[in-house]
Each structure stands twice: as C-alpha cells, then as structure tokens.
Amino acid sequence: MDKLIINGGRKLKGEVTVSGSKNASLPICIAAVLAPGASTITNVPRLRDITTTAKLLESLGATIERHENTMRIDAGTINTVEATYDLVKTMRASVLVLGPLLARFGRSRVSLPGGCAIGARPIDQHLKGLKALGAEIRLEHGYVEAIAKKGLKGARINFDVSTVGGTEHLMMAAAIAKGESILENAAREPEIADLADYLNRMGAKVEGAGTDTIRIQGVSELTPAAYEVMPDRIEAGTFMCAAAITGGDIKINGMKLEHLDALTFKLMDAGVEITNRNGVVRVKGPKRPQAVNIKTRPYPGFATDMQAQFMALMCVAEGASVISENIFENRFMHVSELLRFGADITVEGNSATVKGVKKLSGAPVMATDLRASACLVLAGLAAEGTTEIQRIYHLDRGYEQIETKLAGLGADIQRVSEP
C-alpha cells in the first residue's frame, strides 16, 4: 500500500496545470450509455474512480478504449442492464447508470452504492424522480430494480433538497423520455452545466442547467458525440490553498476562477493575493493568514469539498475561526488527524472552532476520505519536519498525480510503496 512522505516548510513556487474534473467526468462517461455508438471524451483525469467507471461500463458490455486523458466509449455493445455489487460498492456515482439504462432499455437493476463514508447520502431523491417519470421501483436484496415497460414520460420534479447526483441522474433519464420534464430546486454546480452541454451535443434539449430550474424536452434518441470535460475546480481550489498555507507564489493554468468565487473571496479575506490574467490565476500566500469563518453551502456557496483544505489553512492562521459544515454529516473526520500536527481544534455538532497556531509539526497520519487526505497533504506541506500519510488510495480517487504536481512547485514530497 502506498504512502506519502512530505518534508514540510517549503514555499511553493512555479506553475501548475489543473486536470479535468472528476465530478464532471463521472456522469459524462455514464451519460454515454444513452447513445448507441462511440463517444470520445477528452480531458478525463486518470483516477481510480474513472477506472472504476470504465470497468462498470465494460461490465454492462460497453467497449472502452483509454489513452492518457481520452476515453472512447462505445455503448452500442451494451448487452446487460445489471450493475453488480462488486463494482458499485466502491463508488457512489455508479448508481447514476440506473436512469440511463432504464431510459434506453426500459429496465435496469443496480446495486446500492458505496464510496466515501461521509454521512448517509441517501438516493431517495433519485428514486422519487424516476418514479415521477413513470418507473416502477423495487428495492430487494441490496439492489434497485427499475422498470418502465412503456418508456419514461416527462414530469415536473421538485427536489426536497439540493442534490447534485439526483439532478444529474434525472437530467440524463429525462433526456430521452417522452415529453417535457422540469426539475425544480435543481442543484446549480458547474459540473451539472457541463453534463447538460454534453447531452445537448448528443442531441438532447436541456435548458437552464446551472440554475435551480432545468427544462428537458425529451427526444426519441441521442447520437454519440465528442466532448472535452471542464477543469477540476476542487483540484484548482486545493492548489490555491497549498500556495496560501506555504506562503508560496504560484500560477495555475487551465482553471475557471468564476467557479470558485466563494473560496476566492474567503482566501482574499485571509490575506491571500489572487489575480487572474488571460486565464492564468496567480495565488500569493501571506506570511501568515488571518482567521476567517466559513459555512459550507450548495453552489455557489462555499463548497463542502473545500472545507477540509480550508481548515488546514486556518490551523496556522492568526486568530480563531469557526467552520460550519452544512452539507454532509461526519465530515470532520480529518480533525483528529490535524490534531497530530499540533492543531488546536474543537468540534461541537456541525461546527469546528480552529485556533490558529504559529507552526504545525510533521506527524504520522492516516487519510479517512478523499478531501480529508488533501487537507493532510496541505498540513504536511506547511509543517516543520516530516509527515507520513497512510491510506492515500483515498487521495488517488480524486487527484491526478498530485505529488508530481506539488514536487514541480518545489515541494519535498514522494510516494513510497510498501509491501
């Protein structure tokens, strides 16, 4: 099992390029199921979750070809509508194949999902929406079986809560349903707009993605299309925090700063200098950041996927900050590991109070989930001494060669394989 060893205390300097978005790539690759024939998706990051998605699609009979950051998906060879537990258990997004298979073939059977162990994350909104589109849903023996003998029919669906996966799922299913579907209280994340752009490239009629009301005029069929995935805003935000926590000065290529307004404003409040010239974002960290409070919210609010990284920054800030997590329960699992660095953090309910310390000290720590692992990397970069991070397979689920990119910015970081 691999681990990371970091000798901290180095200011990051130089340029780095952001990879394609994991959270956009997953639903886009799954949406290829809707169109018989071969779609070519580019700017796909080389990550464990992407490999899992490719295996999932292959298990359905699709033909997959991968070369570096390009994936060719031929969904014309799909020969089964069942996604089994052994693949679905490792990644929550796998459940998104339920709707596209149902819409195209009239039936699907998918195991209940796994993935990061963050709170309940139920799929009730997904199933409620599919029922509204005319599906019969049965839950038995850990599987969801959906049947629509006469095909799906457009419907008005109002989500009880903002759900990114639910919005993506029903947008895909409604794309080839009969008639118009309206999704109300839809999630507004940029990845949803990216998926809609891909669906429209295939011939779908989706309007309003990126707002809280999405209209989908169903079409009889979709055709395969070529598409380039958007850049990963969470990776970009992680590099912004890395520059800030090390007092570094870096340039980030390939990111869209407008996708990170909430983070950008909070970083600037903390004393970080951020400029955007010709699509290149320069981030210059202060000698010591100022304490800033944050509350995670659905997009365009502060992203829950950036909460852990921002907490790492606040560990070395001047003053005390309060970090409130309003999206997922159990998303403070990184706190106990940050304490090993010498951080001063107390948790009460969904809020953590972070009293900044002048210096963190390197420590042996263990990653608990994807974004928590990134937070530990940031703490290790800022800490004096050596940090050893175990269980970095979590990190590999969402960051493409992050240690190589950080080393390119001057970090003393290496991956070590253990027997």
Curated annotation (Swiss-Prot):
Modified-residue entries (2-(S-cysteinyl)pyruvic acid O-phosphothioketal), positions: C116
GO biological process, one term: UDP-N-acetylgalactosamine biosynthetic process
EC annotation from Swiss-Prot or TrEMBL: 2.5.1.7
Binding residues annotated for UDP-N-acetyl-alpha-D-glucosamine, in chain numbering: R92, R121, P122, I123, D124, Q125, D305, I327
Pathway: Cell wall biogenesis; peptidoglycan biosynthesis
Location of the protein in the cell: Cytoplasm
Active site: C116
Binding residues annotated for phosphoenolpyruvate, in chain numbering: K22, N23
Pfam family, one: EPSP_synthase
InterPro entries (alphabetical): Enolpyruvate_Tfrase_dom, Enolpyruvate_Tfrase_sf, MurA_subfamily, RNA3'P_cycl/enolpyr_Trfase_a/b, UDP_GlcNAc_COvinyl_MurA
Enzyme class label: transferase
Keywords assigned: Cell cycle, Cell division, Cell shape, Cell wall biogenesis/degradation, Cytoplasm, Peptidoglycan synthesis, Pyruvate, Transferase
UniProt keyword Lipid metabolism present: no
Catalytic activity: phosphoenolpyruvate + UDP-N-acetyl-alpha-D-glucosamine = UDP-N-acetyl-3-O-(1-carboxyvinyl)-alpha-D-glucosamine + phosphate
Biological role stated in the UniProt entry: Cell wall formation. Adds enolpyruvyl to UDP-N-acetylglucosamine.
Protein name: UDP-N-acetylglucosamine 1-carboxyvinyltransferase
Gene name tied to this protein: murA
